[in-house]
Amino acid sequence: MAKGKDARVSVILECTSCVRKNVNKESRGISRYITQKNRRNTPSRLELRKFCPYCYKHTIHGEIKK
């Protein structure tokens, strides 16, 4: 039997340095990744170091609202 809410949810990770640069129009775009997280194990916002093709380096990507 399945319980009420699923533990796994899809989340979108967005580059934090591209978001800051986009205000000044220095960046060509904003890097985003789609991944899954377990809501029970990580109830807080997810932050991972991923490669950003617009910054050409590994940066911190934070979870955003859908």
Swiss-Prot record:
Transmembrane feature ranges: none
Task: For this UniProt record, give its keywords in alphabetical order, as a comma-separated list.
Answer: Chloroplast, Plastid, Ribonucleoprotein, Ribosomal protein
A Pfam family reported for this protein in Swiss-Prot or TrEMBL:
Ribosomal_L33
Q: Which GO biological process entries does UniProt record here?
A: translation
Which GO cellular component term is one of those annotated?
chloroplast
Q: Give start-end ranges for the coiled-coil region(s).
A: none
GO molecular function per UniProt:
structural constituent of ribosome
Instruction: Give the superkingdom in one word.
Output: Eukaryota
| Locations listed in the record | Plastid, Chloroplast
Q: Does the record bear Transit peptide in its keywords?
A: no
Family, similarity comment: Belongs to the bacterial ribosomal protein bL33 family.
Protein name as it appears in the record? Large ribosomal subunit protein bL33c
Question: What broad taxonomic lineage does this protein's source fall under?
Answer: Eukaryota, Viridiplantae, Streptophyta, Embryophyta, Tracheophyta
Q: Which gene encodes it?
A: rpl33
